[in-house]
Amino acid sequence: MRTDSGARLEEGHLRPPRALPPVPSQDDIPLSRPKKKKPRTKNTPASASLEGLAQTAGRRPSEGNEPSTKELKEHPEAPVQRRQKKTRLPLELETSSTQKKSSSSSLLRNENGIDAEPAEEAVIQKPRRKTKKTQPAELQYANELGVEDEDIITDEQTTVEQQSVFTAPTGISQPVGKVFVEKSRRFQAADRSELIKTTENIDVSMDVKPSWTTRDVALTVHRAFRMIGLFSHGFLAGCAVWNIVVIYVLAGDQLSNLSNLLQQYKTLAYPFQSLLYLLLALSTISAFDRIDFAKISVAIRNFLALDPTALASFLYFTALILSLSQQMTSDRIHLYTPSSVNGSLWEAGIEEQILQPWIVVNLVVALLVGLSWLFLSYRPGMDLSEELMFSSEVEEYPDKEKEIKASS
């Protein structure tokens, strides 16, 4: 080994140093990453002898770089610190710089295998490749994204935060004087007291003016007419009784004074007959409302069973027909003039023939109206029409909904 090294050294003294080829530019260098060469970890004795001989040679340019190699040997940790402070370059610049350094280092080698590059550049390359430590993936991603250790939340901290959400506040909340209310897509400050007053007024107005439906209106009108019908029943009964009493008083005993009846009653005949007809119509309709005429068989069965409401409706209807049958007689009484007057409708001796059936019909009407009023007063709240028209409709809807669900 020594002989070979000596011979090579003599040849090195005899031969002049070779001229270095030109360094290629950055555009000529391909961007592909060169394969990493395994760094030499151990120095062989031959390399040590070559380094010693290289130091003795005066023509080598490496004499000026001896202090850097000495400093590297004395302070091996210096390149590591310099590498840690060095910022990381982008991928393209890093590949280009590494390719430059690798190409320049390969070109600066002579035939003897000794690097002609300054020792300082080798020192910079060597720790960058050798002292590169592999970091875990999580820490590497965290460093690239700029995440600090304080920003990382562990499982224990999350459990503590979840527990703190459900804890009751220790302090006592106090009401604030101003409240922000949204008006026309903007929040405006308002006093709490005024807001409470306005809400109270709104509640009162809602209580006073509830929303009505058509069913509620129909039910209210029906009940109001039933009250009017009850009043008409009593008033009709009183008017009919008063009418028959006045007729018998004016006619005298055994209808002996019919001329007096005609003279006194002619002013009352037409107005009273109209009032009687109106009251009879209202009472008859009110009595019919209390019967379920949608089911005629049920109405007939109630009449045959002497139901008070069915009997009252039948009696009112009969009284109305009888009253209408005597309408012409009432008109004739209203136009009464003595027989001695020319153009009179009443001849002598026919008063009793005309008035006697009229008095009997009025007596029957009074009896029928009185009996009907008694029957209805026995059960004044009974109203089958209300139960069938309103209550049954409410019950029919759920049945229809059930049928629809069953069919679906």
Curated annotation (Swiss-Prot):
Its main location: membrane. The keyword Phosphoprotein applies. It is a multi-pass membrane protein. Residues 1-137 are annotated as: Disordered. It is found in: Membrane; Cell projection, Cilium. Changing D155A: Found at heterozygosity in a patient with Bardet-Biedl syndrome also carrying BBS6 mutation A-57 in MKKS; hypomorphic variant. GO terms for biological process: cilium assembly; regulation of Wnt signaling pathway. It holds the Pfam family TMEM237. InterPro entries: TMEM237 (IPR029409). The modification Phosphoserine is found at S25, S49. The chain crosses the membrane at residues 227-247, 268-288, 303-323, 358-378. Residues 95-106 have a biased composition (Low complexity). Keywords: Cell projection, Ciliopathy, Cilium, Cilium biogenesis/degradation, Joubert syndrome, Membrane, Phosphoprotein, Transmembrane, Transmembrane helix. One of its GO terms (cellular component) is microtubule cytoskeleton. Residues 1-14, 60-77 have a biased composition (Basic and acidic residues). Part of the tectonic-like complex (also named B9 complex). Interacts with TMEM107. Component of the transition zone in primary cilia. Required for ciliogenesis. Belongs to the TMEM237 family. It is linked to Joubert syndrome 14: An autosomal recessive disorder characterized by severe intellectual disability, hypotonia, breathing abnormalities in infancy, and dysmorphic facial features. Neuroradiologically, it is characterized by cerebellar vermian hypoplasia/aplasia, thickened and reoriented superior cerebellar peduncles, and an abnormally large interpeduncular fossa, giving the appearance of a molar tooth on transaxial slices (molar tooth sign). Additional variable features include renal disease, abnormal eye movements, and postaxial polydactyly. This is Transmembrane protein 237. It comes from Homo sapiens (Human). The gene is TMEM237.
